[in-house]
């Protein structure tokens, strides 16, 4: 699930988890009404990891994960050797074995999030509900966390329903995307390739600044405005770091000549005052070369990110020569 803050993503998850009563309609799991599933039967079907902190006194991380087995233990809550094997496997899957004997209350937020996922996996549910599960994780554990979820959906047929703010992650990992808008209603539901278009994402989140690149799922900040001071000769991925450095410095720039399928093009389109772009696999027209020279003449200096130019890139090689002769390179 994706959508702006306050749209109702957490409300949907809490309704599915029976923490909130739906105002209308019926939630069904495998055709059975959620109202008819209670207690341990529900806990064996569904596990939940929400953003609210749990307060545990004098519990080790293993103790917390072991609570995921209680739907299977009966009235006395005694874990068998088989239960502990499930606990150990769940902790191994999310890489928290080394935290086994540590006090749960004293570990970091990121570690706590991983322990809570291990607890949910120890329940061996059919459905796993997650509310912004990667909020406290660094990039290493974020990738490992999502990889584990993906493996569980494939190998154990686990259904995962989660809210995510990282659009690039949602685009890469999800089979289906549910979009909840500012009107607290479902706006769209479908495959990521149908949802993640620049125009729709801007509308969904009410973006008035910056840009969304549908190819990478990444956001770009607003580019600097005003008279261009720098002309950048880029291409083949050599220009992106320069574009962003100029943006951070607040320096307006022009770039070209870029093919529209070049990896530099989306970043240039988002940040540059002007992009001189040519159609892919076509020879650059002479009028575009003249246009690039005119922009060069207006700029104070030229940055060339390229060292080598191929057969199809003679136009940019000529621009570098022109910049040198003009004393701007």
Q: Regions from the language model: what does each represent?
A:
Residues 66, 81-100:
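Conserved ABC ATPase "signature" region
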Residues 25-33, 42:
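Conserved ABC transporter NBD signature motif
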Residues 124:
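Conserved catalytic motifs of ABC-family nucleotide-binding domains
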């Amino acid at each position: 699930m994706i959508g702006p803050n306050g749209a109702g993503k957490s409300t949907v998850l809490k309704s599915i988890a029976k923490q909130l009563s739906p105002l209308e309609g019926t939630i069904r799991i495998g055709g059975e009404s959620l109202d008819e599933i209670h207690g341990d039967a529900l806990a064996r079907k569904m596990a939940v990891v929400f953003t609210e902190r749990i307060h545990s006194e004098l519990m080790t991380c293993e103790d917390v994960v072991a609570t995921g087995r209680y739907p299977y233990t009966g009235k006395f809550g005694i874990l068998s050797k088989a239960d502990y094997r499930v606990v150990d496997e769940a902790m191994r899957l999310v890489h928290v074995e080394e935290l086994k004997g540590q006090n749960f209350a004293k570990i970091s937020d990121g570690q706590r999030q991983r322990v809570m996922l291990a607890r949910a996996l120890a329940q061996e549910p059919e459905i796993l509900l997650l509310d912004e599960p990667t909020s406290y994780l660094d990039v290493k554990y974020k990738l490992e966390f999502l990889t584990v979820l993906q493996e569980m959906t494939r190998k154990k047929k686990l259904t995962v329903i989660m809210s995510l703010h990282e659009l690039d992650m949602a685009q890469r990992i999800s089979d289906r995307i549910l979009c909840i808008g500012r009107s607290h209603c479902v706006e769209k539901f479908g495959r990521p390739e149908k949802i993640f278009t620049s125009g729709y994402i801007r509308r969904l989140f009410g973006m008035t600044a910056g840009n969304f690149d549908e190819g990478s799922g990444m956001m770009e900040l607003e580019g600097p405005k005003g008279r261009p001071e720098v002309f950048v000769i880029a291409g083949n991925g050599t220009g992106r770091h320069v574009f962003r450095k100029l943006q951070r410095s607040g320096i307006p720039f022009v770039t070209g000549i870029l093919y529209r399928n070049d990896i530099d093009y989306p970043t240039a389109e988002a940040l540059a005052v002007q992009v001189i772009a040519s159609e892919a696999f076509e020879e650059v027209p002479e009028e575009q070369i003249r246009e690039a020279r005119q922009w060069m003449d207006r700029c104070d200096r030229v940055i060339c990110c390229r060292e080598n130019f191929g057969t199809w890139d003679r136009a940019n090689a000529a621009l570098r020569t022109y910049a040198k002769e003009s004393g701007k390179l």
